[in-house]
Amino acid sequence: MDILIGLLIIAIGSFCQSSSYVPIKKVKEWSWESFWLVQGVFAWLVFPFLGSLLGIPAGGSLFDLWGAGGAGMSIFYGVLWGIGGLTFGLSMRYLGVALGQSIALGTCAGFGTLFPAIFAGTNLFEGNGLILLLGVCITLAGIAIIGYAGGLRAQNMSEEEKRAAVKDFALTKGLLVALLAGVMSACFALGLDAGTPIKEAALAGGVDGLYAGLPVIFLVTLGGFMTNAAYCLQQNIANKSVGDYAKGKVWGNNLVFCALAGVLRYTQFFGLEMGKSFLTESPVLLAFSWCILMALNVTFSNVWGIILKEWKGVSAKTITVLICGLVVLIFSLVFPNLF
């Protein structure tokens, strides 16, 4: 029962993250860099900070926890993850919600599982290490199939249909950006690993296992915010869009929807940490929890892609290929449990 509860919590967080781009469509009169920065304030600073407060032992502080070790590396990996988050947003811009998230999150699922194992010295050619490696290979196969579906989609759609579904649709550029986003986004998992001493200190201080990892998440998202804020402000200056923040008549509307997008985006990590606390009885599921989250994100993002009509006008063959790719990705998560 605990495992089912853990998976359900992760699934809820995944659904929220995959829904985070829907409120963004309600933002008015702001350039991409402006709304990305404002939603980032909520997604990577405000809500992670509030969540981290739940992981502080009685009579302690965040600084006490961070002093346990690993804080600097968590922030560093967060900076790298921030590059992934930034290019992740660009992949949505060029490919749309469905295809962009599928490729970026699929790549992130594979490398986010493999990188921690490599750094931990795991032998990838025997035992559990081999299972991890094969699971990643299956994940990458799913990505390739989804990429092929994107190619079919581009061939079968007119220029007008492409622009109607995704304003800045650009397949080649989008694929490259999405792959980079996936690899760099996998650094989030490394940031969590680096912060293990902090989580252990929280547990030793009597914090419930549900919340013990939240102070580490704040460090990783803090690093990510640094990267994204620097880029967005540079783009504000280059594109002369700084004036977006002075458009008082849309501030109320835009702030609400950016905050909503931010809390939805953060919920995936909040749910991941809470869900993992229920998976301790299954080491395999615990090791693959990152992959589980990413695969669910891919599934839900494509559901939103269909709802938002991003696949409108494509052939039945293209949809079939897309579904096959998703099935392969989902199988990559089931695969480790077969042994």
Which sequence ranges carry the predicted segments?
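Polytopic alpha-helical membrane proteins, predominantly small-molecule transporters/carriers
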Residues: 1-339
